[in-house]
Swiss-Prot record:
InterPro entries: Daa-tRNA_deacyls_DTD, DTD-like_sf. Homodimer. The lineage of its organism: Bacteria, Pseudomonadati, Pseudomonadota, Gammaproteobacteria, Pasteurellales. It is an enzyme of class 3 (hydrolase). This is D-aminoacyl-tRNA deacylase. Keywords: Cytoplasm, Hydrolase, RNA-binding, tRNA-binding. Its main location: cytoplasm. It catalyses: glycyl-tRNA(Ala) + H2O = tRNA(Ala) + glycine + H(+); a D-aminoacyl-tRNA + H2O = a tRNA + a D-alpha-amino acid + H(+). A Gly-cisPro motif from one monomer fits into the active site of the other monomer to allow specific chiral rejection of L-amino acids. The gene is dtd. One of its GO terms (biological process) is D-amino acid catabolic process. A motif (Gly-cisPro motif, important for rejection of L-amino acids) lies at residues 136-137. Belongs to the DTD family. It comes from Actinobacillus succinogenes (strain ATCC 55618 / DSM 22257 / CCUG 43843 / 130Z). Its EC number is 3.1.1.96.
Length: 144
């Protein structure tokens, strides 16, 4: 399971011209599910996202996690994160989970995060438009 996290001052995801999810300060989490993923990996990644220290403290050092910074999460499914780009000029998605497994683990990841923080979401498998203001910019690739 892969999470591309971006520290944002605002982020929004629209589906069919309507806002599906919107946050102020927090993390935009683009989430990709691989075929070998399971709930244990989703738990591990959720804990990592929630506890990863990417927000500045009083000395402007990255010592605070999203909860300590009183931020929110916007979680958006993005299967292209699991692409194999090592060969040729076209990505391969053979590492990706089936749509059923990906949807199940995407929803599970969101439920685990919602136990500890406010979470907004996109719509699984939809064509979405994501807008954000990346703060820093600060972007990290996390895997479980």
């Amino acid at each position: 399971m892969i999470a591309l996290i971006q520290r944002v001052t605002r982020a929004q995801v629209d589906v069919d011209g309507k806002t599906a999810g919107k946050i102020g300060k927090g993390l935009l989490v683009l989430l990709g599910v691989e075929k070998e993923d399971n709930q244990a990996r989703a738990n591990k990644l959720a804990e990592k996202v929630l506890n990863y220290r990417v927000f500045g403290d009083e000395n402007d050092k990255m010592n605070l996690n999203v909860r300590q910074a009183q931020g929110e999460l916007l979680v958006v499914s993005q299967f292209t994160l699991v692409a194999d780009t090592g060969r040729g000029l076209r990505p391969s998605f053979s590492n990706g989970a089936t749509p059923a497994l990906a949807d199940e683990l995407y929803r599970y990841f969101i439920r685990k995060c919602r136990e500890k923080i406010q979470v907004e979401t996109g719509e699984f498998a939809a064509n979405m438009q994501v807008s954000l203001t990346n703060d820093g910019p600060v972007t990290f690739w996390l895997q479980s």
